[in-house]
């Protein structure tokens, strides 16, 4: 019965989302001990169990109501949703928040020597992919007939191995494509990590915990996007200096001891401060400019 009273969160056991999912939960105050071979981690300060599973399994665990929350890439989520729909099912879930990591794109790629003018160049080609449903939807929307070559891994080697004419695979930097003499020619899907919840209603206690976690997730993400700025500014240039700073709220202006001409300005900036902005601040007379990271933030 204990497991039914604890919030169950599914995350990727290993792979590109695993580390950042754990970091997000930790920054939200979820204390846990992760053992490499363990499939379940128990929070020591909150009634939360972390299930570490294959990313392909997370959507199904949410659709079937086995776990309460899941952190998953949009590409995997939508691929699994389309697969269920193709079987006549109607999978459902709640999208709680798009997260600030796991960015990638699903793209069509051809051998470097192939010329590419438009999507019609894929007509009749055999395309290797691990995302057959997303590829099928895109090709259908664009009226392209093709032959599917389903692979669960190492998709990029398919053209060299004469398994396929082209590929449809995830791309982050493009280095893997270049290493396999391929070129990216068309992005068909943009993806990032997201936090989802099962459709069935949670108990009052679990929902209260989810609400608390969501507030913390928002705070963590806002803190990551923000910087705390401190500087000294001439009173006569204060308006110009403030105009250079993209703030979340109005700044705090403080007097400086034994200085009638300058004040201290403290504020939270909603954007990273680039060197060009700092140089512009300096030109307007600002001095002692400090830009600090923010660990936690609640509005």
From Swiss-Prot:
One of its GO terms (biological process) is L-histidine biosynthetic process. GO terms for cellular component: cytoplasm. Coiled coil: none annotated. Feedback inhibited by histidine. Catalyzes the condensation of ATP and 5-phosphoribose 1-diphosphate to form N'-(5'-phosphoribosyl)-ATP (PR-ATP). Has a crucial role in the pathway because the rate of histidine biosynthesis seems to be controlled primarily by regulation of HisG enzymatic activity. Belongs to the ATP phosphoribosyltransferase family. Long subfamily. Its main location: cytoplasm. Keywords: Amino-acid biosynthesis, ATP-binding, Cytoplasm, Glycosyltransferase, Histidine biosynthesis, Magnesium, Metal-binding, Nucleotide-binding, Transferase. This is ATP phosphoribosyltransferase. It is an enzyme of class 2 (transferase). It holds the Pfam family HisG_C. It catalyses: 1-(5-phospho-beta-D-ribosyl)-ATP + diphosphate = 5-phospho-alpha-D-ribose 1-diphosphate + ATP. SUPFAM superfamilies: GlnB-like (SSF54913), Periplasmic binding protein-like II (SSF53850). The keyword Transferase applies. It is found in: Cytoplasm. It comes from the Bacteria. Pathway: Amino-acid biosynthesis; L-histidine biosynthesis; L-histidine from 5-phospho-alpha-D-ribose 1-diphosphate: step 1/9. Its cofactor is Mg(2+). It comes from Campylobacter jejuni subsp. jejuni serotype O:6 (strain 81116 / NCTC 11828). Its EC number is 2.4.2.17. PROSITE patterns: ATP_P_PHORIBOSYLTR (PS01316). The keyword DNA-binding does not apply.
């Amino acid at each position: 019965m204990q497991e039914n009273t604890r919030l169950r969160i599914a995350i990727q056991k290993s792979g590109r989302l695993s580390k950042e999912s754990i970091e997000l939960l930790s920054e939200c105050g979820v204390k846990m001990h992760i053992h490499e071979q363990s499939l379940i981690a128990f929070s020591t300060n909150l009634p939360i169990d972390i299930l570490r599973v294959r990313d392909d399994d997370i959507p199904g665990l949410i659709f079937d109501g086995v776990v309460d929350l899941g952190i998953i890439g949009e590409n995997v989520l939508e691929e699994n949703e389309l697969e269920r729909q193709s079987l006549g099912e109607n999978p459902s879930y709640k999208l709680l928040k798009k997260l600030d990591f796991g960015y990638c794109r699903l793209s069509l790629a051809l051998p470097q020597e192939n010329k590419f003018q438009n999507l019609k160049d894929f007509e009749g080609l055999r395309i290797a992919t691990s995302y057959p449903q997303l590829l099928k939807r895109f090709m259908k929307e664009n009226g392209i007939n093709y032959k599917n070559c389903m692979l669960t891994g190492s998709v990029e080697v398919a053209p060299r191995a004469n398994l396929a004419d082209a590929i449809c695979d995830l791309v982050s930097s493009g280095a893997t494509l270049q290493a396999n003499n391929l070129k990216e020619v068309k992005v068909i899907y943009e993806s990032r990590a997201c936090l989802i919840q099962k459709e069935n209603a949670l108990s009052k206690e679990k929902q209260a915990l989810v609400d608390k976690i969501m507030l913390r997730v928002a705070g963590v993400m806002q803190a990551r996007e923000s910087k705390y700025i401190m500087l000294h500014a001439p009173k006569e240039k204060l308006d110009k200096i403030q105009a250079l700073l993209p703030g979340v709220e109005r700044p705090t202006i403080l007097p400086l001891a034994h200085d009638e001409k300058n004040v201290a300005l403290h504020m939270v900036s909603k954007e990273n401060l680039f060197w060009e902005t700092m140089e512009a601040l300096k030109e307007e007379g600002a001095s002692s400019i400090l830009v600090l990271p923010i660990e936690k933030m609640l509005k």
